[in-house]
């Protein structure tokens, strides 16, 4: 259910874009992201920081898009969010409090150096996505950018998640692999 909620704003953004335009889609994205926060809180009694940051960014950039009737703002939102994720991961690693380890370290037990590899891998991924988004958003037609945002970035994130899980599993001590397989 939680994963479905994560995709709700993206699906609504895409559907409204296809039916109307980028401005209606931006407004729908703001509303859908707010709805996502409300439903998540009602179901789980907490809101993750990532969802809150995303909501703030969607609201700010979506509102700017609507007020100035300029799609550049909603396009920049993707780059800014990815850049913030990269910065947060990099800083957490540099101060020896890796976010990914704190989120996943109880389930996936690996050495700190492996968590560092994974963190820097994701920092690189987010920076790459931020830069590619700039290119696609401002060099190609709007419809191409919308498809890239919805399908391309989602697929890339999924592939990188699978690669990360495989890498973590491969570097996990055998006793933890057995324990994980028995769950």
From Swiss-Prot:
Belongs to the YciB family. This is Inner membrane-spanning protein YciB. The gene is yciB. Signal peptide: none annotated. Plays a role in cell envelope biogenesis, maintenance of cell envelope integrity and membrane homeostasis. It is a multi-pass membrane protein. It is found in: Cell inner membrane. It holds the Pfam family IspA. Its main location: membrane. HAMAP family: YciB (MF_00189). Keywords: Cell inner membrane, Cell membrane, Membrane, Transmembrane, Transmembrane helix. Disulfide bonds: none annotated. The chain crosses the membrane at residues 10-30, 50-70, 72-92, 118-138, 148-168. PANTHER family: INNER MEMBRANE-SPANNING PROTEIN YCIB, INTRACELLULAR SEPTATION PROTEIN A-RELATED. One of its GO terms (cellular component) is plasma membrane. It comes from the Bacteria.
